[in-house]
């Protein structure tokens, strides 16, 4: 990687995933050289295909739950985004999910320590579990079932946060923690089990939209470019406590299904199914801290972002297989 001396070097674990690939694009646009690391168990090289031949980009296929060695003498930022993140993935891969939250975080922090790099952890709103406080602020400790099927992801991220703060306090590593709420946009996998691709895929395929429970549970949806902007601002800041990033505009799942049907222009219907175990009833970020510390808030309107996402999936479904 023939970087000029003044170019920051960033490592992105999970670099071929939905968020990791968008983050990579932003870092490159900001003049960073990027080393992306991914074992491809849930990532997709199609997300980084446009970077082929970019002299400031390098991809390494590697499982970060194993020791990470990089020959670069100096690295400026380590973004730890590696982890199965959709219910389908972490229910199918419970032990790898726990390992990347524990061993993967430990290895990524070790890399940051060895290279004197800032460390940015991709955490999640799932650390709040099925919250009893609404909306959720960063000082809420959560309501998590540690032995439930979702617990592998929730507790992996809670442990990762604890490990990150331990490295910050004990080793004086420059660390940041971003708690990511529901995010959507191009490069999501059509069949990853999350509600945005699920509803859009079903609507475009003429299938009923699967609404779990009675549809009264709520979510807040943030477009990916807004999220990445917040992550970049946090990485460049000197703030070390967790920060919520998400869109506080809240809607019920039934309302969301109706919006998808309207915006896809289809005649799809909804079909109600049993609610999964430990599925959160409400989810809405309090972003007061992000506004104050980062001067950040989401800017992409819901309809604008969803239309872009629908078009992405429409093209994906039409592409030859």
Residue ranges of model-derived segments:
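A glycine/serine/threonine-rich, flexible loop-to-helix segment
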Residues: 134-135, 190-198
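Residue-level signature of the cytosolic catalytic core of signaling kinases
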Residues: 53, 148, 188-192, 249, ...
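Nucleotide-sugar-dependent glycosyltransferase donor-binding/catalytic pocket residues
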Residues: 83, 98, 188-192, 220
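Short, conserved catalytic or interaction motifs in soluble domains
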Residues: 42, 186, 247
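C-terminal substrate-binding subdomain of Rossmann-fold SDR/epimerase-dehydratase oxidoreductases
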Residues: 4, 9-10, 23, 29, ...
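N-terminal Rossmann-like NAD(P)+-binding domain of SDR-like oxidoreductases, especially those catalyzing
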Residues: 1-183, 203, 225, 231, ...
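A generic structural signal for short coil/turn motifs at secondary-structure boundaries
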Residues: 186-189, 280
């Amino acid at each position: 990687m023939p970087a000029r001396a003044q170019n920051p070097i960033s490592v992105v674990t999970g670099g071929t995933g939905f968020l990791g690939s968008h983050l990579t694009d932003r870092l490159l646009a900001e003049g960073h050289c990027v080393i992306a690391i991914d074992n491809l168990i849930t990532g997709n090289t199609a997300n980084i295909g446009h970077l082929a031949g970019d002299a400031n980009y390098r991809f390494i296929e590697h499982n970060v739950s194993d020791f990470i060695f990089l020959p670069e003498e100096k690295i400026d930022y380590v973004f730890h985004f590696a982890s199965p993140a959709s219910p389908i993935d972490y229910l199918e891969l419970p032990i790898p999910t726990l390992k990347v939250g524990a061993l993967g975080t430990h290895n990524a922090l070790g890399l940051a320590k060895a290279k004197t790099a800032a460390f940015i952890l991709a955490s999640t709103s799932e650390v709040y579990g099925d919250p009893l406080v609404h909306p959720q602020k960063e000082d809420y400790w959560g309501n998590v079932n540690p032995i439930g099927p979702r617990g592998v992801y929730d507790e992996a991220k809670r442990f990762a946060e604890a490990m990150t703060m331990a490295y910050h306090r004990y080793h004086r590593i420059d660390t940041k923690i971003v708690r990511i709420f529901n995010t959507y946009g191009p490069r999501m996998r059509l069949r990853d089990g999350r509600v945005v691709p699920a509803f859009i895929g079903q609507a475009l395929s003429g299938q009923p939209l699967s609404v779990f429970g009675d549809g009264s549970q709520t979510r807040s949806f943030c477009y990916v470019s807004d999220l990445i902007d917040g992550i970049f601002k946090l990485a460049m800041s000197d703030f070390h406590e967790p920060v919520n990033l998400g869109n506080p505009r809240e809607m019920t799942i039934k309302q969301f299904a109706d919006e998808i049907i309207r915006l896809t222009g289809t005649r799809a219907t909804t079909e109600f199914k049993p609610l999964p175990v430990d599925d959160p009833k409400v989810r809405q970020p309090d972003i007061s801290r992000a506004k104050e510390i980062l001067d950040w808030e989401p800017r992409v309107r819901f309809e604008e972002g969803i239309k872009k996402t629908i078009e992405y999936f429409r093209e994906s479904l039409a592409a030859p297989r």
